[in-house]
């Protein structure tokens, strides 16, 4: 497994920030604004749609590392040939809204096909939140075994939770942080937390085992580069401020549902040994 050198340091230091423009977002003006803001504010890398025209436009005006998201090996191979070195199978929200769901088997097939065709390219795979924790852990371990470099967790999508208030944001971030914690306790693969992430919730993601956080919806609501820059700075400041805070989170989750599920999973695994 190899993480591209231009993002590896931030992942190793567990302070990486990914700005996500959206798998189905082809609004070039907004994407260029987000790109400019990401570069000014020092985001680690940018995640864009698998569109060759957008890739060429961004690469011609920016030096920020680019990742593309898609759900087929063919699209990812095409983008890699266009010079993209970070590929992701994921960003499923647009598909959830259409009633399209992804099984562990389908994710494995896409991932294996992509990895076989592109053995040296950094590959990230999003774990669907619709899977139970036990399935998410098993899928992560299987993906790691075939050489996937990074895992991304997600929270409940907007099609499952339409709340736009603080409650809805916390619900999404709690879901992705729970998955991050469970997976980090059962694998050593770098993890991105990427749902409901804000200045409030980003430090929690790192406490729960993330190496990177992904931000998208909140930054897309802003309508100018200056506001986007300030938002990314706010996220990075929150992360940096909390990096020196050493906290033992085990006491707060010892009796939680997620911990009970992990205990049950461990017992199940032991019974099969």
UniProtKB/Swiss-Prot annotation:
Domain of life per record: Eukaryota
Organism of provenance: Pyropia yezoensis (Susabi-nori)
Keyword vocabulary terms for this entry: Chloroplast, Plastid
Family of this protein: Belongs to the ycf23 family.
Name of the coding gene: ycf23
Keyword Membrane (UniProt): no
Any matching Pfam family: DUF561
InterPro entries linked: Uncharacterised_Ycf23
Gene Ontology CC, one term: chloroplast
Protein's UniProt name: Uncharacterized protein ycf23
Keyword Iron: no
Compartments where found: Plastid, Chloroplast
């Amino acid at each position: 497994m190899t993480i591209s050198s231009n993002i590896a340091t931030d992942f190793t230091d567990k302070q990486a920030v990914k700005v996500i423009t959206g798998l189905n977002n082809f609004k070039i003006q907004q994407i260029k604004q987000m790109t400019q803001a990401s570069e000014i504010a020092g985001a680690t890398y940018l995640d864009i749609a698998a569109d060759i025209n957008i890739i060429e436009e961004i690469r011609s005006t920016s030096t920020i590392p680019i990742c593309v998201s898609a759900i087929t090996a063919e699209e990812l191979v095409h983008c890699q040939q266009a010079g993209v070195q970070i590929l992701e199978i994921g960003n499923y929200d647009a598909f959830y809204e259409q009633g399209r769901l992804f099984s562990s088997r389908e994710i494995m097939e896409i991932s294996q096909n992509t990895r076989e065709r592109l053995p040296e390219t950094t590959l990230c795979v999003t774990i669907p939140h619709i899977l139970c924790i036990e399935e998410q852990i098993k899928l992560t371990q299987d993906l790691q075994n075939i050489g996937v470099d990074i895992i991304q967790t997600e929270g409940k999508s907007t099609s499952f939770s339409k709340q736009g208030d603080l409650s809805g944001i916390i619900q999404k971030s709690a879901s992705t942080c729970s998955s991050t914690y469970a997976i980090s306790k059962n694998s050593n693969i770098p993890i991105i937390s990427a749902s409901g992430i804000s200045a409030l919730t980003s430090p929690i993601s790192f406490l729960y085992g993330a190496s990177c956080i992904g931000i998208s919806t909140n930054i897309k609501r802003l309508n100018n580069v200056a506001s986007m820059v300030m938002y990314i700075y706010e996220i990075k400041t929150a992360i940096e401020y909390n990096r020196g805070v050493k906290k033992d989170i085990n006491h707060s989750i010892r009796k939680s549902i997620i911990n009970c599920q992990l205990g049950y999973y461990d017992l199940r695994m032991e019974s099969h040994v």
